[in-house]
A protein has these predicted regions:
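Short, flexible, basic/aromatic active-site loop/helix in glycosyltransferases
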Residues: 173-213
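A conserved acidic beta->alpha catalytic loop
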Residues: 62, 76-87, 104
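Short aromatic/hydrophobic "clamp" motif used to bind/position activated sugar donors
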Residues: 124
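A short, conserved alpha-helix in the catalytic core of glycosyltransferases
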Residues: 206-233, 237-265
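Short, acidic, metal-binding catalytic loop of nucleotide-sugar glycosyltransferases
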Residues: 61-70
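Active-site-adjacent helix/loop segment of glycosyltransferases
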Residues: 249-327
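Conserved donor NDP-sugar-binding/catalytic core segment of glycosyltransferases
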Residues: 135-168
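Glycine-rich, basic loop-to-helix element that forms the pyrophosphate-binding segment
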Residues: 101-119, 140
Length: 336
């Protein structure tokens, strides 16, 4: 790590890490917790990693370049021995890095809660292990918090490696109806009608100013630790996927405010873990059903929720064969 720090200055290295192929890129009162000190600039970063590749090293490089970082907590949910040897060596050199484990893959939500319990800073950042930040990302985000002290959670513009806004980075609240609208693109029937709002907003008109949104991605969630704890953290019913949507739903129900900051960017590579896709799709299907039963059992008759559950698992079954064949074929070709 020391050698890497000496090789490149901060601005140049951040630009290379973010966009290697681009030259031009480089109220918490609602939950009865105190507003963070306006002068607080300390943040604990929580990163949950499961079978993550070398992108984790790049992620950590971008984290350690940030101002305001007091602590980086890496939750090992089951990485390779080689990668963890590298992480342990890095922890010996970088005192801010703490490595903890739940002794196996305990799920994303539970791992986040485990990491937050170790956090010491007033602010916490939940960051995916395949995300790379520009210099001063956290510092600039904290300035937004200090200027808007009633904010519950902040996210930034999460981009794909090609610079496009990533799907799921900003969304409307997920309901059974918005899922139907999204799946069948019913918004095309009446594009401006509030009844036909799409779930994902990455194809909507780009936001130019800091804006309130209903739902964001768990790839980058910055908030006061008091907000996270007052909501009870992530719901551990969810093993993988949808826990971030559930968290946003609970913020919305509690009267909280989520802000999207479009002029701060983070690159999220996505799908960097070497995991059998059937495992991911199965837990995603279970999480969708958990979410709908948890939040909509009073609004929708049980038979409608059962239809949704049947549809979700049918979709899982249909997708299982092609995704599995593709994954195993890739393994054969690459010899991994």
């Amino acid at each position: 790590m020391d050698k890497l720090k000496k090789n490149l200055d901060e601005e140049k290295r951040a630009k290379i890490l973010l966009y290697p192929n681009k030259n031009d890129y480089a109220k918490t009162s609602f939950i009865n917790c105190d507003t963070p000190n306006a002068n607080s600039d300390h943040c604990s970063v929580i990163i949950v990693s499961y079978k993550t590749g070398s992108i984790l090293i790049e992620c950590l490089q971008s984290v350690f370049l940030q101002k305001s970082i007091q602590q980086v907590i890496l939750v090992d949910n089951g990485n390779s021995r080689t990668l963890m040897q590298q992480m342990n060596a890095l922890a010996d050199e970088e005192p801010r890095l703490e490595i903890i484990t739940g002794n196996g893959n305990i799920g994303f939500a539970k791992a986040c809660n485990l990491g937050v319990r170790r956090a010491r800073s007033e602010f916490i950042l939940l960051l995916n292990p395949d995300s790379i930040m520009e210099v001063d990302t956290i510092y600039k985000s904290l300035k937004v918090f200090h200027s808007k002290p009633n904010t519950s959670v902040i996210t930034v513009k999460i981009e794909n490696p090609d610079g496009s806004e990533q799907r799921g980075a900003r969304r409307n609240l997920m309901t059974p109806w918005t899922c139907v609208v999204e799946q069948f693109r019913l918004d095309r029937l009446a594009p401006n009608h509030p009844y036909f709002k799409r779930l994902n907003l990455n194809e909507a008109k780009p936001l130019q100013h800091i804006s309130r949104v209903q739902c964001i991605s768990g790839a980058f969630m910055l908030m006061p630790r008091a907000v996270y704890n007052s909501l009870g953290g992530m719901d551990e019913q969810y093993f993988l996927h949808v826990e971030d949507v559930d968290f946003c739903m609970r913020i919305e129900k509690s009267g909280g405010i989520i802000l999207f900051v479009p002029n701060i960017r983070v690159m999220h590579q996505k799908s960097s873990s070497d995991v059998y896709p059937g495992f991911i799709e199965w837990h995603k299907a279970k999480s969708f059903c958990t979410y709908f039963n948890k939040h909509f059992h009073m609004q929708y008759p049980k038979w409608i929720l059962n239809i949704f559950a049947t549809t979700i698992y049918f979709r899982f079954a249909v997708r299982l064969v092609p995704t599995s064949v593709s994954w195993f074929w890739k393994k054969i070709i690459t010899g991994v």
